[in-house]
Amino acid sequence: MHVHPISTFRVFQEGHLLRNSIAIFALTTLFYFIGAELRLVHELSLFWPLNGVMAGVFARYVWLNRLHYYAISYVAMLVYDAITTEWGLVSLAINFSNMMFIVTVALLVVRDKRLGKNKYEPVSALRLFNYCLIAALLCAIVGAIGSVSIDSLDFWPLLADWFSEQFSTGVLIVPCMLTLAIPGVLPRFKAEQMMPAIALIVSVIASVVIGGAGSLAFPLPALIWCAVRYTPQVTCLLTFVTGAVEIVLVANSVIDISVGSPFSIPQMFSARLGIATMAICPIMVSFSVAAINSLMKQVALRADFDFLTQVYSRSGLYEALKSPSLKQTQHLTVMLLDIDYFKSINDNYGHECGDKVLSVFARHIQKIVGDKGLVARMGGEEFAVAVPSVNPVDGLLMAEKIRKGVELQPFTWQQKTLYLTVSIGVGSGRASYRTLTDDFNKLMVEADTCLYRSKKDGRNRTSTMRYGEEVV
């Protein structure tokens, strides 16, 4: 996958009152305009994105949850209505109902954040579903009461229409707003990575062609596929687009769910609730996959890295040897390092000092080796370094560089300065990527033999074996 860097821009910034106020006013006006343009049948909008968007904004940026910011959003709604409608005082009640949804969802999500609840838990999606349900009901009660005088419908049909619209748009938009992020780089997808999205488009087309109430569920398998393959951000965005498109297509009878009978509000009520219920499924799956992936990374991190020294563990080293970056390996040098007289450090200064020595030692070795090799703790005070190279001499030079670097590096413990030394055994030979693990194991045996020779001959030395002879 190729990536292209893109610049990032933040609309809201903490502590910038004027900037945030202008942004809230502009955003409210923009999405009020979009919703007003979708008033196709009655005075009520077919699809009202404003409340979901603003609820997501206030929920996402905790520091925006201030009375004056909410007031600015409310005033923006009133100003728009004053310019474009003749609702008069009725506008106060209708827009207050909008604020009911925004404030309810925002405060409930902010409460979850303060309680430290994970945003990528499956239960998080279910909580959002419930929050939108509660907020939509409160919004619908106030809105239906306020809009009776400007709409030809009675209270109960208005309540059903208002509730279903707020609930469906909330479930579609709020998760999208909470997860939306501008990536630092723009990925270029491969053809096979686009298959779930293509399947989603085909399923929506099938809904149009086949029709019927059941056709609204056609995109669900494709959305589940997207949830498994894509990130929660992409999944929520695709779910929102799919749900919004279906609602618009149903309202315009492009997707015919009326089965020969005249289209009515109860059918729109059912369609919206069905789409909202369907939408939460891929979001829950996506959050589940994200949680599992996060857990797997933590497990892999614990298995592949030594907790104390933060270098590879034994198993992690073997996994690293499988990396495609080592495909050009022609020669491999394996070093076994043993800190000299480490037991006396534990005996004289305590195990806490010993742990600190191991940590500092590993960090120093990692700094010397850099990206030229792999460093791992094999157990106790014994470490291994694997250096893939083209020239056999490179590994031996690296071993001596490590030995001298350790010898010259002072270690301070409780105002006492200690100097460490290390004995190194080196195994060196030809290697290829296909057999790299086997080659490593063979050279480990050779390095272990040479390490024994280094310790036997007085420690603080590097030993290697060439052509059957031992060279120090």
Swiss-Prot record:
Substrate binds at residues 346, 351, 355. GO terms for cellular component: plasma membrane. It catalyses: 2 GTP = 3',3'-c-di-GMP + 2 diphosphate. It is a multi-pass membrane protein. The chain crosses the membrane at residues 21-41, 44-64, 90-110, 128-148, 167-187, 198-218, 237-257, 273-293. Catalyzes the synthesis of cyclic-di-GMP (c-di-GMP) via the condensation of 2 GTP molecules. It is found in: Cell membrane. One of its GO terms (biological process) is negative regulation of bacterial-type flagellum-dependent cell motility. Keywords: Cell membrane, GTP-binding, Magnesium, Membrane, Metal-binding, Nucleotide-binding, Transferase, Transmembrane, Transmembrane helix. Its EC number is 2.7.7.65. Pathway: Purine metabolism; 3',5'-cyclic di-GMP biosynthesis. Residues 330-467 form the GGDEF domain. It is an enzyme of class 2 (transferase). One of its GO terms (molecular function) is diguanylate cyclase activity. It comes from Escherichia coli O157:H7. The keyword Ligase does not apply. It comes from the Bacteria. Homodimer. Binds 1 Mg(2+) ion per monomer. Mg(2+) binds at residues 338-339, 381. Disulfide bonds: none annotated. This is Probable diguanylate cyclase DgcF. Its cofactor is Mg(2+). The keyword Nucleotide-binding applies.
